[in-house]
Structures are given as C-alpha cells and as structure tokens.
Amino acid sequence: MKTVTVRDLVVGEGAPKIIVSLMGKTITDVKSEALAYREADFDILEWRVDHFANVTTAESVLEAAGAIREIITDKPLLFTFRSAKEGGEQALTTGQYIDLNRAAVDSGLVDMIDLELFTGDDEVKATVGYAHQHNVAVIMSNHDFHKTPAAEEIVQRLRKMQELGADIPKIAVMPQTKADVLTLLTATVEMQERYADRPIITMSMSKTGVISRLAGEVFGSAATFGAVKKASAPGQISVADLRTVLTILHQA
C-alpha cells in the first residue's frame, strides 16, 4: 500500500487524517472562516467552492484561493466543487467544471483537487493527468445522499477510481438502516484488503453512520471529515472530539 504525501502530511499511515470544509459565500466570508479555522486541530483544509457565489468568475475564485492560502499557510488545501447532483450547492456544465479545476491546478495555490467519478471517464482521466503534471493530487469522489449501494457496487466504484488514476478514492453513502452502515464498512475492508494499492476514504453519513467517521483506522479509511463550525455533511462531529476518538483508537 503506497501512501500519499501532500506538503508534509502523509495520508495512509497512522491515524486517519482530519479534513475540514470551508464554505464561505463571499471573499469576506472565506477570509473570516479561514481566520476562525487557523487555531483548529485538523490536517487538510477543503475549500467547498460550490458555496462561493462568484464561482463562474475565475479571477474571483483565484483571489479567494489566494486569500485562504495567505491565512492557512501550512496545511494542504483541497479544492472541491461539489456538483448539485452529488449534494453540492450549484450546478456547472461539465466543461465549466473541468475548466474550474484546471484553473485551480494552474494557480499553484492548491495541493489537491476533488474530481467526481461520474464526470465522464475521458474528462476525468485527462484532468487527473493534468493535475499530476502540476504536482497536484486528486481525490476522486462519489456521493449518494439517498441510499447505500450494495457492497459489491461500492467496491466497484472505488476500484474504478483507482483505475482512472485517483491518488485517493473516496465514497460517501447514506444509510437507511444500521445494516447499511455495516455494508459500507464491509465494502471498505474488502477494498482495502483485496484491491487498494493506495489510501481510500469512505463514510456512511448521518447520525446513523457516525461510527464510520470514527473507526476508519480499524476498517481501512485513511481520512475523515469533521466540523469546526457548520457541518458540510450530515453526521460530522467536532474536530476536537474527532481527534480525541481517533487518537484513542490509534493507541489502543
């Protein structure tokens, strides 16, 4: 299993890494959130660009990215436009989405981008290659806010991400029952033990799935999302509580 190193952070060894999401709508909001996050205990800062009002203006996006980078200087920055169809705030055409991610890569301000698996294989492959040429890592993602697919389907999607060149495959699914949480955990173990040659991130959302956000080290998920202020997805818990639990499980 190879690890992924971003700045000085090694993902895929030790306790799962904590990712927090910044979701400001304006550049003023983005700056104030980044300042508020500066003292929080996390490993990776995700900028959820789909919350940013001026997302279709590249200059505004890059100005905001620069502002974040000036305030949070030492942590890896993950650039994420979550599409409306996968639970995000706005919709872009495929062309706009790819152009936005390429602009982020070109900027030199971000360390990682999030690419949704179902954007289209050709577009995804080309954008992964482009990111890698610029030393930007790729988290490839899929989100189902309605249900939990069968374990075989979860594994298949994660394997597809790996085949398309993702540095870190990621999937988040919604449980309707407690058994659905076990389905996600079973799929995580199977992927991690049988197929993965790189770190993966998995989670079962909502309060029902919260155990999956805590027990990643046990089952094979290399990172988890926590909340500094407002949760970016259902079931997230505070970073302070998250770090405590992750450390307990790591040292057990």
Swiss-Prot record:
Disulfide links within the chain: none
Binding-site positions, 3-dehydroquinate: S21, E46, W47, R48, R82, R213, S232, Q236
Keyword Amino-acid biosynthesis set for record: yes
Signal peptide: none
UniProt KW Lyase keyword: yes
Pfam family, any one: DHquinase_I
Gene Ontology biological process: 3,4-dihydroxybenzoate biosynthetic process; amino acid biosynthetic process; aromatic amino acid family biosynthetic process; chorismate biosynthetic process
EC number of the protein: 4.2.1.10
PANTHER family: 3-DEHYDROQUINATE DEHYDRATASE
Family: Belongs to the type-I 3-dehydroquinase family.
Protein name: 3-dehydroquinate dehydratase
